[in-house]
């Protein structure tokens, strides 16, 4: 059509061909700052409905959203759907092998893959706040990679938690 508009969205402009870029009107979008997301959260949401306890702070959720209010809502929803069995054990890295197997089973049975990846993000933030251990973050990043590649979720969680438990954290 002569009056048609084609909208092309990308997070990696440098990967597009110059011939494509030259024909586009570039509009750069930026994420909201943590303060802006916090303001949105306070102004538009009833925080009393959140199942947030000592393990997960509002600031952890804001950090996990990376400036996206919709991702913040998704993370809150996923956190609220988690059973207490899971949240109670994810306060810090698990050391007991039996608990690792139990939690891995619960996570893989109760959550879809995208929810599991979101949970990994939240775990990273909680554990980073408590331990400041880079190894933990790298190991959990590998877990996200395994989950995205559709490697058996339960096995992925078990291997990751067991690796972490063998480290002196």
Protein language model features and the residues they cover:
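Charged, glycine-rich active-site and insertion segments that engage polyanionic ligands
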Residues: 2-5, 12-122, 126-169
């Amino acid at each position: 059509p002569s009056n048609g508009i084609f909208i092309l969205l990308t997070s990696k402009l440098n990967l597009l061909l110059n011939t494509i870029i030259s024909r586009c009107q570039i509009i750069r979008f930026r994420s909201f700052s943590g303060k802006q997301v916090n303001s949105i959260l306070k102004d538009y949401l009833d925080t009393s409905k959140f199942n947030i306890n000592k393990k997960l702070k509002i600031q952890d959720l804001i950090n996990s959203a990376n400036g996206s209010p919709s991702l913040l809502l998704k993370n809150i929803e996923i956190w609220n759907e988690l059973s207490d069995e899971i949240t109670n054990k994810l306060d810090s890295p698990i050391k007991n092998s039996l608990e690792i197997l139990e939690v891995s089973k619960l996570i893989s049975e109760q959550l879809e893959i995208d929810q599991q990846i979101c949970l990994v993000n939240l775990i990273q933030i909680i554990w980073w706040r408590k331990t400041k251990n880079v190894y933990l973050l790298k190991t959990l990043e590998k877990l996200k990679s395994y989950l995205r590649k559709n490697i058996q979720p339960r096995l992925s969680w078990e291997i990751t938690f067991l690796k972490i438990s063998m480290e002196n954290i």
